[in-house]
């Protein structure tokens, strides 16, 4: 007969019961229940270290407690004199089939249960309702008997109560017949007593509650599709449990080798089917448990090949349902699906070497097998569907341990590594990496606008009212400044930054007004806000805008090459009539000696000049009372009197109080205020609809800072154009200095205009019709054409 050990349970507290297992090898001795078991696992304390020990019946210094129903070996280590030196508090989970074995008659069980319940009490800190508190007595080679106090728990984890000051509270789970044989502990190094035994010094085996159902025959494999009666998840109506297993390589000196984190009811991101949830769990979502462990590289035993373990190994098991194969397929996409999964402890101990997981001490090892006949097909279909859905999102998730110790699902930025709580925050953050976003086919070369439609790009260019440059496509990444071509968008973006640094304080000037800015984007905004409505006629070739159709028609001749205007004296042709007139005046002035004194038009003979002069005389019907001015109509005469002889501005704008001579001018001015927000200067009462004009006002009137300084003389200027003019004084050219003010220039004609227009009160050039004086002849001619056009044609 095989030697056996006795498990003595002294029922000193009420509300505890124990069902013995075996073939006639159980009896009740007073208040003691004697149970004979074939195999167990024991945790002892020796020299301050914890060791997992298995005891064989034929070893002189060890005891074997063996399960008679199933041979599942967790670890077998030679036991030496390690039991002396202290007491150990531990939690032992007895196999469920052992505890629920049908032994004895109903009377015997009732007597045993009543006796136990009246003499046992459940500690307050124990979570499991089915608790047996007793004393495990095992013979010791030296002392003869060494007692280990602990708790015997069925089904779930408990929190041990420390019994003595130097007691080490640990948790040992002996796998029952419906759970995987795994041990959970935190930071327990195992002594190496025999070179032939497996060294457990550098890795930790992790406990998994209800990992999967194991058949009564321990040598058989377990399939995901099998449903075992008596499943705890079925009996209590709980949800299936998702167990996520992470195996990491440990850093040198790392003490915390693993742990278990319970996650509350998971969200629907596991992608389980609705029918699966409704039919089995009443619509409840599966719970999740994340188990993580580490493996050190300092392993010397040949059975443990840490090098074969990847830096990060991930495995997932769903307990209690056969649709588990479809769970979390997005986390399994990058790894091949293995048909057989080893328990975590064996995976850590043997890596990919499954040959080592064979009969140890004559017992067979159980492997976890996934039935992929039905689940793999669903996994493939859902993977393809998920991939099609995920092509547009392109966002990955990660799980981190939060400050409170609970796992958090975050969305990391794949560029800079920042982590965000939601996909929306990540999408908003991705705008900070425009060079890494998906590039569209067409993009505007004047701003950052991109589109996939050519029509949309054309409409966008019309809003600019600028000359469109060559449209770049995704394959044609060319720098607009130097023409250099790049293969990647980020390289082009970095190259453009070098141009921006070289440009420095380059100013962008509006071609329609005096606005200037250092940023191209601000200039584009100014063009859209101020000048977009002024140029409704757009050239379809280059996108340039014009105020009138005649200007657009004239401009189109530059694209078609048409030149309809022919010189009568030579073969010169022009697309513009004004260019033809200029040509005749400069090249053929001798051929046209007769010139009109009013409009300066020339003729080839005197007869043509006389006919032309009659036109000027017939139009002089309206005489000005203040001067000799004559007009062809009353409205023209009225405009003359108001503009020349009236300094008062009777028509005032109610918004900005600007005055005008005529109501039409006021009406046109007020139209500019409609629909525009007025911007008030915070330093004075100045306000205007154009924010850029307000900025220029503040810079020129209220700002004492001079940002633009000359590098030679350190003189400051408010605008860069002023600095450019000043730099001409250092070019070595002759400088014309005004004797009345600080104005100076290298341009002689500009200096002359300055003196005449600013410092001269004399108006030497008088109008022939109204005697109005002008400083320059050009001003006089412009006045004549504007106010005496009819008279000049006579």
Swiss-Prot record:
Main location (coarse class)? nucleus
Q: Which domain of life is it from?
A: Eukaryota
Tell me the InterPro entries matching this sequence: Ikaros_C2H2-ZF, Transcrp_activ_Zfx/Zfy-dom, Znf_C2H2_sf, Znf_C2H2_type
Protein source organism: Xenopus laevis (African clawed frog)
Pfam families per the UniProt record, alphabetical: zf-C2H2 (PF00096), zf-H2C2_5 (PF13909), Zfx_Zfy_act (PF04704)
Record-stated family: Belongs to the krueppel C2H2-type zinc-finger protein family. ZFX/ZFY subfamily.
Question: Which keywords, in A-to-Z order, does the entry hold?
Answer: Activator, DNA-binding, Metal-binding, Nucleus, Repeat, Transcription, Transcription regulation, Zinc, Zinc-finger
Q: What does this protein do?
A: Probable transcriptional activator.
GO-annotated cellular components: nucleus
The Gene Ontology terms for molecular function here are: DNA-binding transcription activator activity, RNA polymerase II-specific; RNA polymerase II cis-regulatory region sequence-specific DNA binding; zinc ion binding
Q: Which segments does the record annotate as C2H2-type zinc fingers?
A: 411-433, 442-464, 477-499, 508-531, 537-559, 565-588, 594-616, 622-645, 651-673, 679-702, 708-730, 736-759, 765-788
Q: Where is this motif: Nuclear localization signal?
A: 380-389
Subcellular localization, per the record? Nucleus
Q: Which Gene3D superfamilies match?
A: Classic Zinc Finger
Q: What is this protein called?
A: Zinc finger Y-chromosomal protein 1
Q: What biological processes does GO assign it? A: regulation of hemopoiesis; regulation of transcription by RNA polymerase II
């Amino acid at each position: 007969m095989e030697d056996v050990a006795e498990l003595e349970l002294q029922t000193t507290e009420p509300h505890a019961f124990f069902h013995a297992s075996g073939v006639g090898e159980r009896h009740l001795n007073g208040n003691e229940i004697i149970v004979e078991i074939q195999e167990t696992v024991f945790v002892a304390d020796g020299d301050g270290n914890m060791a997992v020990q298995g005891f064989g019946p034929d070893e002189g210094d060890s005891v074997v407690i063996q399960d008679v129903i199933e041979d599942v070996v967790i670890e077998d280590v030679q036991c030496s004199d390690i039991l002396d030196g202290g007491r150990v508090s531990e939690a032992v989970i007895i196999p469920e089939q052992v505890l629920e074995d049908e032994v004895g008659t109903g009377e015997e069980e009732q007597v045993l249960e009543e006796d136990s319940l009246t003499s046992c009490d459940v500690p307050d800190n124990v979570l499991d309702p089915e608790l047996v508190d007793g004393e495990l007595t095992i013979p010791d080679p030296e002392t003869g008997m060494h007692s280990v106090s602990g708790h015997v728990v069925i089904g779930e984890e408990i929190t041990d109560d420390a019994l003595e000051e130097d007691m080490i509270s640990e948790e040992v789970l002996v796998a029952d017949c419906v759970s995987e044989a795994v041990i959970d502990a935190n930071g327990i190094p195992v002594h190496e007593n025999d070179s032939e035994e497996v060294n457990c010094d550098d890795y930790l085996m992790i406990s998994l509650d209800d990992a999967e159902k194991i058949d009564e025959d321990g040598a058989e494999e377990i399939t995901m599709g099998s449903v075992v009666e008596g499943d705890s998840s079925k009996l209590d109506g709980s949800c299936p449990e998702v167990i996520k297993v992470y195996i990491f390589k440990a850093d040198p000196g790392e003490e915390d080798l693993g742990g278990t984190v319970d996650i509350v009811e998971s969200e629907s991101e596991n992608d389980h089917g609705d029918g699966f949830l409704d039919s089995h769990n009443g619509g409840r979502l599966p719970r999740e448990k994340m188990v993580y462990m580490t493996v050190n590289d300092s392993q010397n035993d040949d059975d443990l090949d840490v090098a074969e373990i990847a830096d990060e190994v991930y495995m997932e098991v769903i307990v209690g349902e056969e649709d588990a194969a479809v769970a979390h397929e997005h986390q399994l996409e990058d790894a091949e699906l293995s048909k057989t999964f080893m328990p975590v402890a064996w995976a850590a101990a043997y890596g990919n070497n499954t040959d080592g997981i064979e009969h140890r001490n004559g017992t067979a090892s159980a492997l976890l097998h996934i039935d992929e006949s039905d689940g793999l097909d669903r996994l493939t279909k859902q993977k393809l569907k998920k991939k099609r859905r995920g092509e547009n999102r392109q966002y990955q998730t990660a799980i981190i341990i939060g400050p409170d110790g609970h796992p958090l699902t975050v969305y990391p930025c794949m560029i800079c590594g920042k982590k965000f709580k939601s996909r929306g925050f990540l999408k908003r953050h991705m705008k900070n990496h425009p060079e890494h976003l998906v590039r569209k086919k067409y993009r505007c070369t004047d701003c950052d606008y991109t589109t996939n439609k050519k029509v949309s790009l054309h409409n966008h260019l019309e809003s600019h009212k600028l000359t469109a440059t060559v449209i770049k496509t995704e394959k044609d990444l060319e720098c607009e400044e130097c023409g250099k071509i790049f293969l990647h968008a980020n390289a082009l973006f970095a190259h453009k930054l070098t141009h921006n640094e070289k440009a420095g304080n380059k100013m962008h000037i509006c071609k329609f007004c005096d606005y200037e800015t250092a940023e191209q984007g601000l200039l584009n905004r100014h063009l859209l806000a101020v000048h977009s409505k002024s140029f409704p006629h757009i050239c379809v070739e280059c996108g340039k805008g014009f105020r009138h159709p005649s200007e657009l028609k004239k401009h189109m001749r530059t694209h078609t090459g048409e030149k309809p205007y022919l010189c009568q004296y030579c073969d010169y042709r022009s697309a513009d009539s004004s260019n033809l007139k200029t040509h005749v005046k400069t090249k053929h002035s001798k051929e046209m000696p007769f010139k009109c004194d009013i409009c300066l038009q020339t003729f080839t003979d005197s007869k043509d000049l006389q006919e032309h002069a009659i036109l000027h005389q017939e139009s002089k019907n309206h005489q000005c009372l203040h001067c000799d001015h004559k007009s062809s109509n009353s409205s023209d005469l009225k405009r003359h009197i108001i503009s020349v002889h009236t300094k008062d501005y009777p028509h005032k704008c109610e918004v900005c109080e600007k005055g005008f001579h005529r109501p039409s001018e006021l009406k046109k001015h007020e139209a500019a205020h409609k629909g525009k927000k007025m911007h008030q200067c915070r330093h004075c009462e100045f306000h205007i609809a154009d924010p850029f004009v307000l900025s220029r006002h503040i810079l020129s009137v209220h700002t004492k800072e001079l940002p633009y300084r000359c590098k030679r003389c350190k003189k400051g200027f408010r605008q860069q154009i002023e600095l450019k003019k000043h730099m001409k004084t250092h070019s070595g050219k002759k400088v014309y200095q005004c004797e009345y003010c600080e104005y100076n220039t290298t341009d002689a004609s500009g200096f002359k205009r300055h003196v005449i227009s600013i410092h001269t009160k004399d108006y030497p050039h008088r109008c022939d019709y109204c005697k109005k004086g002008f400083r320059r002849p050009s001003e006089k001619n412009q006045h004549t054409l504007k106010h005496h056009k009819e008279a000049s044609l006579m």
